[in-house]
Amino acid sequence: MTCKNTRRLYQIITTFLRYGIDEIIPDIPLTRHARLGRKALFWVRNQHKDQPFGVRLRLALQELGPVWIKLGQMLSTRRDLFEPELAEQLALLQDSVEPFDGKSARQIIEQALGGSLETWFDEFDEQALASASIAQVHTAKFNQNQPLAGKDVVLKVIRPDIEPIIKADIALMYRLASWIPRLSNDAKRLRATEVVREYEKTLLDELDLTREMANAIRLRNNFENSEMLYVPEMYQDFCHKNVIVMERIYGIPVSDVETLKANGTDMKLLAERGVQVFFTQVFRDSFFHADMHAGNIFVNPNHPENPQYIGIDCGIVGTLNQNDKRYLAESFVAFFNRDYRRVALMHVESGWTPPDTDIDAFEQAFREVCEPIFAKPLSEISFGHVLLNLFNVAREFNMEVQPQLVLLQKTLLYIEGLGRQVYPQLDLWQTAKPFLQNWLNEQVGVKAILRDLKQRAPQFREHFAEFPEAVFNALQQQKQINFRLDELNKTLQAQGRQKSHNVRSIVSGVIILGVLWRFDDLPLWLSCGTLVTVLLVLLLQRKS
């Protein structure tokens, strides 16, 4: 470890000590050296004994700076790992820091674009419009030499020298994380190294603004001409790893409820559209904005009777596959139907809990945790907390962590919070139910069968010529086996007809399995056709 890293580690440790965070260190042999180290730093006292632990942890992270603030924000979404009071305190962390010098921002932009700012822009404001731990934004407008002359823009700039700071602090986090699981079984459950690895990926992705650009373009295309959501345009010719240029938007912050009401906004429709936007992203697009907190969501002040959201900052997004979406849709529908066995089976069928899981015990665990939720009216039930309860139960049955679902659950909590802030009477279930049912119908209904056949048509054409021969071979094999069965029957007659029937049934079952295995590479309906043919032959032979 370098001298610089050692100094930083000392700073981190003493900061935690001044806020009494060391009280969580258990008195066990493994922590003996840590406790001795605490005594060695006897002059560093807990200066905030009158504050609850959650408040002290939040203040400590705030003092340690941007990297630790963002870690706390991420941990606040992991309500499957922490007590609600602690998670709520971490959620109060604000990613707002002093801006760096505007002249430095100008220099970074000019270096990225390869020329003076005045070549492309007028009215560049060196005073940052907003500043966060990773980047800050400045305003300008395209000059008369540009096709979009006079268009207002925002330039986002990565902080200088932030990457080495992040990497140094992440390295220290890994050291601390490797020690945590040895403290206790509860500490193992935190999976601290996985949390740090997930956080590292998120941070490093945010350092590459071309990712944000690509995400914004994809989201904008998904909602092109939509009345529900508008995503500002990215000007790709001006976008680089550390600088992006985008359309400037003018909207009302979604958290400014009084201004929205004064503008005549239809608050009920606005709240419902927030839920609709989220579920459209999840079930239609399999791609969702995963950082939809109040600072990134605005409302178009025009046509307030038909309110439209404006979404910015697409640095963090989530993606889902068919298995993820099926899990979500079926789990929610089964939950609201109070079909806890189906919820349990969904976790096993998804492959996220071991195949030998005791389904009866799993079902009962879901029932005990979820049934009390129905003491509330359906309109007051939180989807985010339902998902959290499902995760908590599943973890007790060794469910593997699904980062994409954790990200989705965090986003769902944001959406619910904003929706009920805008319109407290929002009925999430009634708003989301059509999306869930329509998606399930499309996956298992007639449309799904026709779509599957259409997708498999090339395979069918390729294997069609093999079908008659395959059926003929299967029937020939059946004849040979029947001959041997008859021989076997003669020797078993003394033991009664029932045993003979059982043998025939067992062997027939083996044949059927063999046919299924033999044609597993054929289209679904072609394999089924072969199986039905063999079954008919068996039935006719049995009657004869």
From Swiss-Prot:
Phylogenetic placement of the source organism: Bacteria, Pseudomonadati, Pseudomonadota, Gammaproteobacteria, Pasteurellales
GO cellular component: plasma membrane
Signal peptide: none
Organism: Actinobacillus pleuropneumoniae serotype 5b (strain L20)
PANTHER family per record: CHAPERONE-ACTIVITY OF BC1 COMPLEX CABC1 -RELATED, PROTEIN ACTIVITY OF BC1 COMPLEX KINASE 7, CHLOROPLASTIC
UniProt keyword Cell inner membrane, yes or no: yes
Binding residue positions for ATP: 129-137, 156
Pfam families registered for this protein in UniProt: ABC1 (PF03109)
GO biological process, one term: regulation of ubiquinone biosynthetic process
Protein known as: Probable protein kinase UbiB
Similarity section: Belongs to the ABC1 family. UbiB subfamily.
